[in-house]
Regions:
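Short amphipathic alpha-helical heptad-repeat segments
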Residues: 1-5
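Collagenous Gly-X-Y triple-helix signature in extracellular proteins
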Residues: 6-200
Length: 200
């Protein structure tokens, strides 16, 4: 009886592996809006580039996270430290380190100031310009909370020392102080020749 049970378990495992393999597709074949599943949640394709794919988590990856105690400069923020350590490590376990592309992001403020320059990283929140570009894809009224961008609203010199742009579930954008707590919906760029499990 015990042997039969073990054989049944082994058969179930083999069938599951076959199903998983059948659902595997090359990331480059997915279109914007398409979803794929991983051990850490579902991702949405935002854009296909030559050999690379821009993706974002379908849901909030973390909740109740502070941007920073006093800075709206993403490069100096607590949120960047979280993305560069804990979140990146979780992504690397799923996609492998070499498949996550390091890239530069423009930290121009919402009102067009260049005070914060650019940031180079692998995993981060979207910028305001990216939120605007992908707004039709990002909207999800089922999200439980707003989420951070890495874009400051303005600067101290213009009277906005602590404000950062945040995105609502329906895609609307507002500002709040950096010390508030919101969700994190990480963005990254992956090599598009990897294989993923296509979602429904």
């Amino acid at each position: 009886m015990k042997q039969m049970l073990e054989k049944a378990k082994e058969l179930v495992k083999m069938l599951q592996a076959a199903v998983d393999e059948e659902q595997q597709v090359q990331l480059s074949t997915l279109k914007p809006r398409d979803k794929f599943t991983t051990d850490i949640g579902e991702f949405i394709v935002l854009e296909q580039l030559e050999g690379q794919t821009k993706v974002i988590t379908a849901k909030l990856f973390k909740e109740n996270v502070r941007f920073d105690d006093s800075s709206t400069d993403y490069k100096k923020s607590e949120l960047k430290k979280l993305c560069d350590t804990e979140i990146l490590q979780e992504f690397e376990k799923v996609f492998e380190t070499d498949n996550i592309v390091e890239h530069a992001a423009d930290l121009t403020t919402l009102d067009g100031q260049k005070a914060f320059g650019t940031v180079v990283c692998k995993v981060r929140p979207l910028t305001f310009d990216e939120v605007r570009k992908y707004t039709e894809i990002l909207s999800d009224k089922e999200l439980p909370d707003w989420y951070w961008t890495c874009t400051a609203w303005s600067t101290k010199e213009r009277g906005w020392e602590y404000s950062v742009a945040v995105v609502g579930p329906s895609g609307n954008v507002s500002d709040d102080v950096c010390g508030s707590q919101y969700g994190v919906r990480p963005f990254c760029i992956l090599k598009s020749n990897i294989f993923v499990s296509k979602g429904e």
